Amino acid sequence: MDRHGVCAALMAGDNEAVAGAQRAHPGRIFGEYHASPTDIMRAVRELEHYVRDCGFVALRIEPFLWRKAPTDRAYYALYAKAAELDVAFQAQVGHTGPLFPSETGRPTYIDEVALDFPELRIVCGHIGWPWTEEMIAVAWKHKNVWIDTSAHVPRHYPPAFVHFLRTFGKDKVCFATDYPLLRWDRVLPEVDALELDPDVKRRFLHDNAARAFKLAS
């Protein structure tokens, strides 16, 4: 991180391993609670534990693993708890890399969740591709919705997304890599090649994520 000027990073995976990494690197690594679809009420209790006791900053759900769209009632207790705890909800949005049906990743489902939970900060991964313009519309509509760029290299961002990032969406896009899938030494030079205005670049690389996840770094 230091070598590439990265001041903070979000981490998800095995929850105990993430908690250990956050303890080892306070103020640099911020954990996300990765919810399992097998026991909802256990997940609700674990979310509270990892936020209150371990300092996690987000609930992370990958709907394709649950085989349920984000609007399914199975998630709503978790959304309510995340809103109560004032942590973000980070969702996999867009097609799935693994061989699962992609329908659960349609951005339009996030529209309904944002309406039902206006206090819940929602960060949508993978630029919503291939439904990126649909994702842009949802993020623009809702003040509590952001888009992140995980798993997408800047040179392949769709033109509509780059325009959104540069202009009316400059407060709505959070830089992400999906590390180690994409590494900073590959992606950050491509961010430089976008030649963003300094103010836009600062928001993209830092300010928007700091606001969406309420990071102190």
Where do the language-model regions lie?
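Conserved, mostly hydrophobic/aromatic
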Residues: 1, 18, 50, 82, ...
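Mid-to-C-terminal alpha-helical segments outside catalytic/metal-binding sites
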Residues: 1-4, 162, 169-174, 181-217
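Active-site gating/metal-coordination segments in enzymes
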Residues: 14-104, 155, 217
